[in-house]
């Protein structure tokens, strides 16, 4: 819980300093920056300090359970007490789905998640709390957007776009009440399966969009291929290189977007 808000500022500072020190290196380099958030959403609402006062016994049992996990932290439940803005004022329409009409795995997984992870129970009738969960999720993204924006500005100031490949992606989403579910679960809804994947290379001076299906297993081959790796090097990895999609997909230049009415 709260590992994103605890560690992401440190990850950002180390990344920023590393880029400042190595931006002009003559030798090619590879840098992977992995922020934790928006993963903190998994622990809502037990990671909120107001919840501790409202449900002290539940919080106490959760804290004892978390203390058994050797994460190397002084406090495995430090708590989140920043203000959460109201980005949205309505729940998604599919929040009102009936889980009794869905596959049994939905209910079984939710029950197990609440029992063993103990993130805090949210009543179906407490729509205000479900909405707060979504706004918390969005706020975690906003916090990380600040770091990403600063890193991109640094890349621009150091004129790195001319010789640097940048890839942005994530591992999974969160239901946050969509289909009346929480967390990443064991289902194939768009909210957790449709991940952002942006690739920018020095050779691209226009935007391209593709609806082609890809997977995280394709990333290693794609990175090696973009870096000019040999076929022998590529054969060591599973998946497929996505470089073909950069040249063979739906193409939108600014003129084309205008013509399409975008």
Identify the role of each PLM range.
Residues 1-27, 35:
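Active-site-proximal alpha/beta segments of enzymes that process anionic O-linked groups
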Residues 24-25, 35-163, 167-170, 174-213, ...:
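Active-site-proximal cap/lid insertion segments
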Residues 30, 179-182, 243-248:
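FAD-dinucleotide binding site
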Residues 30-33, 197-198, 223, 262:
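A short aromatic-rich beta-strand->coil structural motif
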Residues 202, 211-248:
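Non-catalytic, well-ordered alpha-helical segments in soluble enzyme domains
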Residues 252-262:
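Single conserved hydrophobic/aromatic residue that forms the stacking wall/gate
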């Amino acid at each position: 819980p709260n590992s994103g808000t605890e560690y992401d500022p440190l990850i950002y500072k180390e990344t920023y300093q590393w880029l400042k020190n190595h931006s002009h290196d003559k030798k090619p380099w590879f840098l992977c920056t992995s922020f934790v958030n928006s993963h903190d959403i998994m622990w809502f609402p037990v990671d909120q300090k107001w919840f501790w006062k409202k449900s002290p016994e539940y919080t106490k049992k959760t804290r004892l359970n978390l203390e058994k996990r050797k994460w190397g932290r002084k406090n495995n439940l430090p708590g989140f007490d920043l203000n959460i803005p109201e980005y949205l004022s309505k729940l998604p329409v599919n929040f009102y789905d009936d889980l009794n009409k869905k596959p049994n795995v939905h209910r079984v997984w939710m029950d197990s998640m609440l029992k063993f992870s103990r993130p805090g129970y949210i009543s179906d009738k407490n729509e205000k709390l479900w909405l707060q969960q979504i706004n918390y999720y969005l706020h975690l993204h906003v916090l990380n957007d600040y770091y990403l924006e600063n890193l991109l500005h640094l890349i621009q100031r150091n004129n790195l776009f001319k010789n640097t490949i940048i890839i942005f992606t994530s591992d999974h989403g969160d239901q946050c009440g969509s289909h009346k579910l929480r967390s990443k679960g064991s289902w194939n809804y768009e909210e957790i399966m449709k991940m952002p994947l942006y690739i920018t290379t020095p050779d691209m001076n226009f935007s391209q969009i593709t609806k082609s299906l890809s997977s995280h297993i394709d990333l290693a081959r794609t990175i090696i291929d973009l870096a000019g790796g040999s076929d022998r090097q590529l054969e060591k990895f599973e998946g497929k290189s996505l470089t073909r999609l950069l040249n063979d997909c739906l193409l939108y230049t600014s003129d084309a977007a205008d013509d399409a009415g975008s």
